[in-house]
Amino acid sequence: VEAAKRGARVTAVDLSATLISIARERLPSHIGQGSIDFRVGDMSSMELGEFDHVVAMDSLIHYDVADGIRVLAGLADRVRGSILFTHAPSTVLLELMHASGKLFPRGDRSPAIQPVSERRLQKMIARERCLQRWHRGRMQRINRGFYISQACELLPG
């Protein structure tokens, strides 16, 4: 919404039709000169076209780490500017929470995440051919109560 308020044409994608519906309902009546095109689908779909920037907030945390890197690589071929994404950092607290979550019956658990250390993530990014022209930009740890993630920026060049 903030990008649209600043004039951007935003494509908002999620696999969940329910979440897209909620996002549409919560959209403010006035978003300035920009626009938001809500779509149910896979953010890695080539049909979405090219982008100036990509923000994958809490999307890749639900992928196996290697699959998440492949998604980033696929996006990188279609992005002219930056890629911002979050991942679940490998911390003692998060590893304990992740392990204890496995004790509950499957229906009572939140969606699976796979914590990964920053070092391992950066090595995997560096080894991915399609990401070799990209370099790490800003990094920011987000820690709010039980929510922990690591925001990462990839920049071309």
Where are these regions (language model features)?
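Class I SAM-dependent methyltransferase SAM/SAH-binding core
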Residues: 1-45
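A conserved beta-strand element that flanks and buttresses the S-adenosyl-L-methionine
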Residues: 55-56
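Hydrophobic adenine-recognition pocket in adenosine-nucleotide-binding enzymes
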Residues: 59
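A short, conserved alpha-helix within the catalytic core of class I
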Residues: 63-75
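Conserved beta-strand signature within the Rossmann-like core of class I S-adenosyl-L-methionine
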Residues: 79-89
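Short, glycine-/aromatic-enriched active-site segment of Class I SAM-dependent methyltransferases
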Residues: 94-111
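Short alpha-helix
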Residues: 111-131
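Core SAM-dependent methyltransferase catalytic element
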Residues: 137-157
